[in-house]
């Protein structure tokens, strides 16, 4: 249905339009005026917006083709649609390469490793039957030389590629291999690590030097590591030189030349440090060719500042000079050249030790080592002058030469060197007086070793009273909280009594012999005897009998020890037997067991001869009464004991003739021995 409009309505509409146009024209005039005024501002805003839009569009412009366009382009050119675009293929290949690279850094599972060994290396199942793969296995070493597959190496060594990038982890694994004695795997792991295996290879060199005691192997590792791509650092050189310097025997000339060659190389590169120079000096001092150390001393190394350790080693190198005159000339010349800042107590101690160790009759006779100790350290010079006369030997360099006003304080190393030198050159009286002076001052520097040297001096110089004096020294040492008692201390006391018991003044006088015997037995009772719950008392240990029997033998060489005293010693010996001190489970050498058993047999023999009776027939034996009867029975018991001890001696020597069940036989013999020992212990020899 259409819309109808009348003429009146049309006229009204036209009028309205004309009026609206007139009003609009008036408004436009006003707006034009306003717009004209605002135009500069609008232009500025439009320009700014346009500028920002331009930068945004420029930064967001996509200059690469999209995957859709690339596929359409290929469709137009070749008539088919690509499954993967080149960019997608590149991304996939890159991902595969990363995964493969990551896989190459992992170890094979053990089943896969065995499969590879069978397939690619043609190893049969029989060879692999008893083979285990892993870091703790020893049966897989042969496969390390068959393959170049790193993943198989990782399986055998128990590592992966990521761990090879960490030098600390490599060093820890190398240390584990070395503790298990797997040197081949340790070396192979360090080789695989290349630059990260420097610390591990240093540990291997140190192991060869200190544990295996193979300097040649350490030198081989030092040379080969360059070819393996494992660099040599400062610690590598120090470990090698230090190991050569600590070898018990002098190292050969070729090792000395290697040291010199290495130092020359470092010196040419201006990389030589004091540590490397000092260790090289120490190594060359221990070389058979003494000329090499002096070549190093005369070598000019630019940039090297010699310290006190360097000069100390230089002094030590003078010990290689055999000629006496040249020794003193070189040594004194060196001492004069030492700068003030390098002189300390350690350097002067080394100087004194070098003089004391020189095996020159003239130097020893002149006592130059003692005078050097007196000059540089705070010894009492009045005591020295009382026992020594200063002979014509080269004058010592005075302390004033280095602007030092007074001698250095004493320490245990200096006193120990002094005591050693006195023992070596038989200056016993000087050593004893100096020791007593220091002990009277309650000097804390007197340690265990110095007391031992003093006891050795007493044993050497005073054979008649050395046992009593060493026992007194032992008691002083035992009362000191700073000094501990060792087995060496006890042995020195025993040695002192053994030496004292050999003197005729002691063993030819009954009272002196028994007094000495009582002292040594009292010492054993208080120090070495242990409580036995089985016997409810103290018993002597096996080690005590090794020393007591010789002392008893010496004291009784003139039959001055009474029968009662010998019976008392036999009683102690039987108590030790009953307590199991000489049993099979006791750990002692065959020689010691044989010696103690023989001495026990000799003691029984002496007692048997002491209570010997005239020959009697059966009727006379039956008629014996009282003391004679007891004496006869006691002698019979001793003879039975002697027979048992002889059988024990045969067992020790491996010549036993006992037959039957060993367990039953030993049990019955123990019962017989216990019964016999109880009978002997109950018998008193006071009236024999």
UniProtKB/Swiss-Prot annotation:
It is found in: Mitochondrion. The keyword Protein transport does not apply. The keyword DNA damage does not apply. Keywords: Mitochondrion, Transit peptide. Residues 1-46 form a transit peptide. Gene3D superfamilies: Tetratricopeptide repeat domain (1.25.40.10). It comes from the Eukaryota. Residues 1-24 are annotated as: Disordered. One of its GO terms (cellular component) is mitochondrion. Coiled coil: none annotated. InterPro entries: Pentatricopeptide_rpt, TPR-like_helical_dom_sf. Associates with the mitochondrial ribosome. Component of MIOREX complexes, large expressome-like assemblies of ribosomes with factors involved in all the steps of post-transcriptional gene expression. Present with 432 molecules/cell in log phase SD medium. This is MIOREX complex component 1. It comes from Saccharomyces cerevisiae (strain ATCC 204508 / S288c). The gene is MRX1.
